[in-house]
């Protein structure tokens, strides 16, 4: 706990969190602490870390691509998928001068949690010194859900408690678990919604028992020809089911984060809608389903181009209305595409690539405050669609 106070938010921030969050929700949290046998310090830490990650003006870098997925990225820039190249890319990102002031958390793949810089410093220590919380991907991917039309459920609950304990000891303070749903004529089915919602809830409570803030990620794929109204309807159904499941499992909502898709038309719909329309439908879906106790919503980019993801986030934050949560980002491809293009696996391109990453991080920071002016769209690859059908990490 002292590590958190001194290296991430400071004692004054911790005290503010204690008084505003703990005392305000004291009756509810006392019951949860008794029921789940959380220590009082553990509860404080979960809530403070979740609030810190959701700090306005900051967001999450999702650098948790599996070895196979990062290999596909490397193919596009003619780079061999070996450990040294994966480490070099991570170091490029994590050591970009000035960039981590816009980042509150970084989601890591297990390999990266234990990797070091070329000079021998653990990446986790680099993050801590910059005031960035390390996170970890804990799911084991998806498998087909029997009795459905190709729908999936996420695996990884077996042994999750032991893994979370190990990751916490290694420095991780939050976790991510991705559930995937699709829109079709009869999808998502009630079975798929229920199975994925309860899987997310079981994951969330196991994380909290072991000190990790769970990011709840029910991603509704953009694949399909549906319109934006259909996406909004499905998003509301899925989020409502998720929060019912989280309640049933006695998850402390103040110590969680939500990572949803934005509400957009399907990739095959042929429909182009303005950012203001996406913002209206997205915020309305959240207003109808997400409790105010949740400190932050960290959007996934869902295959949008870097620029689309930033512009749409900016529109969401400019929209007037009730928004009791911080609305920020948890982007992977939408923070790294122009950086990858600039780098190309060459040492002499590191400075150029870091400038591209800094520009995107700053742009998304501005978007979380509704102040992005469009001045980061000139980077190579910034307007390139990143959609991959049936995308898997």
UniProtKB/Swiss-Prot annotation:
<dbReference type="InterPro" id="IPR029768">
    <property type="entry name" value="Aldolase_I_AS"/>
</dbReference>
<dbReference type="GO" id="GO:0003729">
    <property type="term" value="F:mRNA binding"/>
</dbReference>
<feature type="modified residue" description="S-glutathionyl cysteine; transient; alternate">
    <location>
        <position position="207"/>
    </location>
</feature>
<feature type="modified residue" description="S-nitrosocysteine; transient; alternate">
    <location>
        <position position="207"/>
    </location>
</feature>
<dbReference type="GO" id="GO:0006094">
    <property type="term" value="P:gluconeogenesis"/>
</dbReference>
<feature type="binding site">
    <location>
        <position position="333"/>
    </location>
    <ligand>
        <name>substrate</name>
    </ligand>
</feature>
<dbReference type="GO" id="GO:0006096">
    <property type="term" value="P:glycolytic process"/>
</dbReference>
<keyword id="KW-0963">Cytoplasm</keyword>
<keyword id="KW-0324">Glycolysis</keyword>
<feature type="site" description="Necessary for preference for fructose 1,6-bisphosphate over fructose 1-phosphate">
    <location>
        <position position="393"/>
    </location>
</feature>
<protein>
    <recommendedName>
        <fullName>Fructose-bisphosphate aldolase 4, cytosolic</fullName>
        <ecNumber>4.1.2.13</ecNumber>
    </recommendedName>
</protein>
<dbReference type="GO" id="GO:0005829">
    <property type="term" value="C:cytosol"/>
</dbReference>
<dbReference type="Pfam" id="PF00274">
    <property type="entry name" value="Glycolytic"/>
</dbReference>
<feature type="active site" description="Proton acceptor">
    <location>
        <position position="217"/>
    </location>
</feature>
<dbReference type="GO" id="GO:0004332">
    <property type="term" value="F:fructose-bisphosphate aldolase activity"/>
</dbReference>
<dbReference type="InterPro" id="IPR000741">
    <property type="entry name" value="FBA_I"/>
</dbReference>
<dbReference type="InterPro" id="IPR013785">
    <property type="entry name" value="Aldolase_TIM"/>
</dbReference>
<keyword id="KW-0704">Schiff base</keyword>
<keyword id="KW-0456">Lyase</keyword>
<comment type="subunit">
    <text>Homotetramer.</text>
</comment>
<comment type="function">
    <text>Fructose-bisphosphate aldolase that plays a key role in glycolysis and gluconeogenesis.</text>
</comment>
<keyword id="KW-0702">S-nitrosylation</keyword>
<feature type="active site" description="Schiff-base intermediate with dihydroxyacetone-P">
    <location>
        <position position="259"/>
    </location>
</feature>
<feature type="binding site">
    <location>
        <begin position="301"/>
        <end position="303"/>
    </location>
    <ligand>
        <name>substrate</name>
    </ligand>
</feature>
<keyword id="KW-0318">Glutathionylation</keyword>
<comment type="pathway">
    <text>Carbohydrate degradation; glycolysis; D-glyceraldehyde 3-phosphate and glycerone phosphate from D-glucose: step 4/4.</text>
</comment>
<comment type="similarity">
    <text>Belongs to the class I fructose-bisphosphate aldolase family.</text>
</comment>
<feature type="binding site">
    <location>
        <position position="73"/>
    </location>
    <ligand>
        <name>substrate</name>
    </ligand>
</feature>
């Amino acid at each position: 706990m002292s590590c958190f106070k001194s290296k991430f938010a400071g004692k004054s921030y911790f005290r503010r969190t204690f008084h505003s969050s703990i005392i305000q929700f004291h009756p509810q949290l006392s019951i949860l602490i008794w029921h789940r046998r959380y220590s009082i310090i553990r509860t404080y830490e979960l809530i403070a870390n979740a609030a810190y990650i959701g700090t306005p003006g900051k967001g999450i870098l999702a650098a948790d691509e599996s070895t196979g997925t990062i290999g596909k990225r490397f193919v596009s820039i003619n780079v061999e998928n070996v450990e040294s190249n994966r480490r070099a890319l991570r170091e490029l990102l994590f050591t970009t001068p000035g960039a981590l002031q816009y980042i509150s958390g970084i989601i890591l793949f297990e390999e990266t949690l234990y990797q070091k810089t070329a000079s021998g410093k653990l990446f986790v220590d680099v993050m801590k010194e910059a005031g960035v919380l390390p996170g970890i991907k804990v799911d084991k991917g998806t498998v087909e859900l029997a009795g459905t039309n190709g729908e999936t459920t996420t695996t990884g609950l077996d042994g999750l408690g032991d893994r979370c304990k190990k990751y916490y000891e290694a420095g991780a303070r939050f976790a991510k678990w991705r559930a995937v749903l699709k829109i079709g004529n009869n999808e998502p089915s009630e079975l798929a919604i229920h199975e994925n919602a309860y899987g997310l809830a079981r994951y969330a409570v196991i994380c909290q028992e072991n000190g990790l803030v769970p990011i709840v990620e029910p991603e509704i794929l953009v694949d399909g020809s549906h319109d934006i109204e259909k996406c909004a309807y499905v998003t509301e159904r899925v989020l409502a089911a998720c929060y019912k499941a989280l309640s049933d499992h006695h998850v402390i909502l103040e110590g969680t984060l939500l990572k949803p898709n934005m509400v957009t038309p399907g990739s095959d719909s042929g429909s182009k809608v303005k950012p203001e329309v996406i913002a209206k439908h997205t915020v309305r879906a959240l207003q109808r389903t997400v409790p105010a106790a949740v400190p932050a919503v960290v959007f996934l980019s869902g295959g949008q181009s870097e620029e689309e993801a930033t512009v749409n986030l900016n529109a969401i934050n400019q929209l007037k209305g009730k928004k009791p949560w911080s609305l920020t980002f948890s982007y992977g491809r939408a923070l790294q595409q122009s950086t990858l293009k600039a780098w190309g696996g060459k040492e002499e391109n590191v400075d150029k690539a870091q400038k591209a990453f800094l520009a995107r991080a700053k742009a998304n920071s501005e978007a979380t405050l509704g102040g992005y002016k469009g001045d980061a769209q000139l980077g190579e690859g910034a307007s390139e669609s990143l959609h991959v059908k049936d995308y898997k990490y």
